[in-house]
């Protein structure tokens, strides 16, 4: 079974995002995706989307001392900026922590231990 998702989307609530949730869902559907994770910069997604054929995963992209961290399935605001504390905070919210840009030259993510 093939499932197609984009797990790193920014909405109009991020400096580098332009689209509303409705526009994101419409665009993703047009490209054959079954869902997306909306992870705005340092702002948890609190809006909900109810559609039986599309999954909108709430998230946040945290700016930490060692690069950007995605918190998937997070609906609460997280203020931690030290990477370990941010990962722990994501987990405490029941979320999944993923480095946003692990191969970016300015990131230390390649040298990090797995959590």
Spans of features found by a protein language model:
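A metal-dependent hydrolase metal-coordination microenvironment
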Residues: 1-96, 100, 107-113
